[in-house]
């Protein structure tokens, strides 16, 4: 309340500074005033914060079996990797939900684990190129409806050197979340080519390894969980710019790489070395299986530092795709490549048909090139380019048939014209 003789015009909101005449209502407290506009703003802030916690608590986390079944619809093969990823992702988001849930004593043992903090379990994905590592992670993020960012480890360097700082990875996640930091803090970051930042030798080097061990050291904190300062425009940090603060404690990191040569390290440890004429054949047949036997000590010999390996407790592998798997990838999943091109042709009112021989030939070419599933789209583009160039200019074509000859020998595809009905003569 104002003192006697004090002008009521001097009464102002203690928060926004507006006078009593500028607002609808001014509420007095012990020595302070607050206007109706500030009260409304405070209510909005409280509601937003409560909604964030409520959304996280009410988020219906799919069970591992449901995650696995969803991956089955889009990704061919790699069942062991799907199971490992489904369990790891489920446990990660269950851990986040438990952190936001109210304390309770109904834990089956009298609530004795209320003070236990569950550590984050990041994932290391090992396997040859073109086997679906990136696609697995993308599909997981789509199922969970969380922000997802992909980064390339080869572009990263230690702070102060030419290249990208590790914080730029976090900027990609923030951008994927439309700069909603709270949402980004529960996202997934996929770092590819992680094997390319292995140190040059097993023993620590005297010279500075800015793109190998230096990057591993720089990644340690954000992998474990820290509040990082991210330049909003990317690039290098400088002291006079503003930063976005993001807590990486609940960000799931999936790091992946081909790790070429790791099978030899595993083989030397397990004593599985071939001798004589059968050696190459023996190695080739067991190379895919050897990745599944990887141990932390093998990764240490490969060039990852112990602290980095320790922050990737979940290690899973993917294997090379065989001919049957490549054929299935072309036609079976919900968003199979063949279905995508059929939809594009359908927009022009044309049906696109592949016979079995064509699919077999495309799979064989991908195997010959050694590009795995990644090479399938490139082959399809090469095969369909002449048709996609001419077809929009033609209105007489009803369907296009792609055969084995078209794929292997560059033959012209079969063009089936529209059927025109003849008019009956009078």
From Swiss-Prot:
Zn(2+) binds at residues 13, 16, 35, 38. InterPro entries: AAA+_ATPase, ATP-dep_Clp_protease_ClpX, ATPase_AAA_core, Clp_ATPase_C, Clp_protease_ATP-bd_su_ClpX, ClpX_bact, P-loop_NTPase, Znf_CppX_C4. One of its GO terms (cellular component) is HslUV protease complex. Keywords: ATP-binding, Chaperone, Metal-binding, Nucleotide-binding, Zinc. GO terms for molecular function: ATP binding; ATP hydrolysis activity; ATP-dependent protein folding chaperone; protein dimerization activity; unfolded protein binding; zinc ion binding. ATP binds at residues 128-135. The keyword ATP-binding applies. Signal peptide: none annotated. One of its GO terms (biological process) is proteolysis involved in protein catabolic process. Residues 1-54 form the ClpX-type ZB domain. SMART domains: AAA (SM00382), ClpB_D2-small (SM01086), zf-C4_ClpX (SM00994). Pfam families: AAA_2, ClpB_D2-small, zf-C4_ClpX. The keyword Nucleotide-binding applies. ATP-dependent specificity component of the Clp protease. It directs the protease to specific substrates. Can perform chaperone functions in the absence of ClpP. Belongs to the ClpX chaperone family. HAMAP family: ClpX. This is ATP-dependent Clp protease ATP-binding subunit ClpX. It comes from Pseudarthrobacter chlorophenolicus (strain ATCC 700700 / DSM 12829 / CIP 107037 / JCM 12360 / KCTC 9906 / NCIMB 13794 / A6). The gene is clpX.
């Amino acid at each position: 309340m104002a003192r006697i003789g004090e002008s009521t015009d001097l009464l102002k909101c203690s928060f926004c500074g507006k006078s009593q005449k500028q607002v609808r209502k001014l509420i007095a407290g012990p020595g302070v005033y607050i206007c109706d506009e500030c009260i409304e703003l405070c209510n909005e802030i409280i509601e937003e914060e409560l909604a964030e916690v409520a959304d996280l608590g009410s988020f219906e986390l799919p069970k591992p079996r449901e995650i696995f079944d969803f991956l089955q619809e889009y990704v061919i093969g790699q069942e062991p990797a799907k199971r490992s990823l489904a369990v790891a992702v489920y446990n990660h988001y269950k851990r986040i939900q438990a952190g936001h849930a109210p304390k309770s004593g109904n834990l089956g043992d009298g609530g004795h684990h209320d003070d236990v903090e569950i550590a984050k379990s990041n994932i290391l994905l090992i396997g040859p190129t073109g086997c679906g590592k990136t696609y697995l992670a993308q599909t997981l993020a789509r199922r969970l409806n969380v922000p997802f960012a992909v980064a390339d480890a080869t572009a990263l360097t230690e702070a102060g050197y030419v290249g990208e700082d590790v914080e730029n990875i976090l900027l990609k996640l923030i951008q994927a979340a439309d700069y909603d930091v709270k949402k980004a803090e529960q996202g997934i970051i996929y770092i590819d080519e992680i094997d390319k930042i292995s140190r040059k030798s097993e023993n620590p080097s005297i010279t500075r390894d800015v793109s190998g061990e230096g990057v591993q050291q720089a990644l340690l904190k954000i992998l474990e969980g820290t509040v990082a300062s991210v330049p909003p425009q990317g690039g290098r940090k400088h002291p006079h710019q503003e930063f976005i603060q993001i807590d990486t404690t609940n960000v799931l990191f999936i790091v992946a790489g081909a790790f070429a040569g790791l099978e030899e390290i595993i083989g030397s440890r397990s004593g599985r070395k071939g001798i004589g004429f059968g050696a190459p054949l023996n190695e080739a047949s067991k190379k895919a299986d050897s990745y599944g036997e990887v141990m932390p000590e093998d990764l240490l010999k490969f060039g990852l530092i112990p602290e980095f390996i320790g922050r990737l407790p979940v290690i899973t592998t993917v294997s090379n795709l065989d001919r049957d798997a490549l054929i299935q990838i072309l036609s079976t999943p919900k968003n199979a490549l063949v279905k995508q091109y059929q939809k594009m042709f359908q927009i022009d009112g044309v049906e696109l048909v592949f016979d079995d021989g064509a699919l077999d030939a495309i799979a064989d070419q991908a195997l010959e090139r050694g590009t795995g599933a990644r090479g399938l789209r490139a082959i399809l583009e090469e095969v369909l380019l002449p048709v996609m160039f001419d077809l929009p200019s033609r209105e007489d074509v009803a369907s296009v048939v792609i055969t084995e000859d078209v794929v292997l020998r560059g033959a012209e595809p079969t063009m089936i014209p529209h059927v025109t009905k003849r008019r009956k003569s009078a």
